[in-house]
């Protein structure tokens, strides 16, 4: 499990990205790169990192479900994800 502070940091970054999204797009369209640099670092969407909603794990993230591969396997095995089952042929 990831530290709570890491999870909170990602949430804070996501809020900051949403707050400055319109201003960032406007400055990019104008070509005003000096003003773009003056924005906070964490306002850039590049600094966001996908994390598992359950554990906060940063690696092995499956976008379709929003969880890590480990949690996906565990939940699918327990039948907690509708329509997902172990493959057999």
Swiss-Prot record:
GO terms for cellular component: cytoplasm; small ribosomal subunit. GO terms for molecular function: rRNA binding; structural constituent of ribosome. Keywords: Ribonucleoprotein, Ribosomal protein, RNA-binding, rRNA-binding. Signal peptide: none annotated. It comes from the Bacteria. HAMAP family: Ribosomal_uS14_1 (MF_00537). Belongs to the universal ribosomal protein uS14 family. Part of the 30S ribosomal subunit. Contacts proteins S3 and S10. This is Small ribosomal subunit protein uS14. It comes from Parabacteroides distasonis (strain ATCC 8503 / DSM 20701 / CIP 104284 / JCM 5825 / NCTC 11152). The lineage of its organism: Bacteria, Pseudomonadati, Bacteroidota, Bacteroidia, Bacteroidales.
């Amino acid at each position: 499990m990831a530290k709570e502070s890491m999870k909170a940091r990602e949430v804070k970054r996501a809020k900051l990205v949403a707050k400055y999204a319109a201003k960032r797009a406007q400055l990019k369209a104008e070509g005003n790169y000096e003003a773009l640099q003056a924005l906070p670092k964490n306002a850039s969407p590049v600094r966001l990192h996908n994390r598992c909603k359950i554990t906060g794990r940063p690696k092995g993230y499956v976008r379709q479900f929003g969880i890590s591969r480990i949690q996906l396997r565990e939940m699918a095995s327990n039948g907690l994800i509708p329509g997902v089952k172990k493959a057999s042929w």
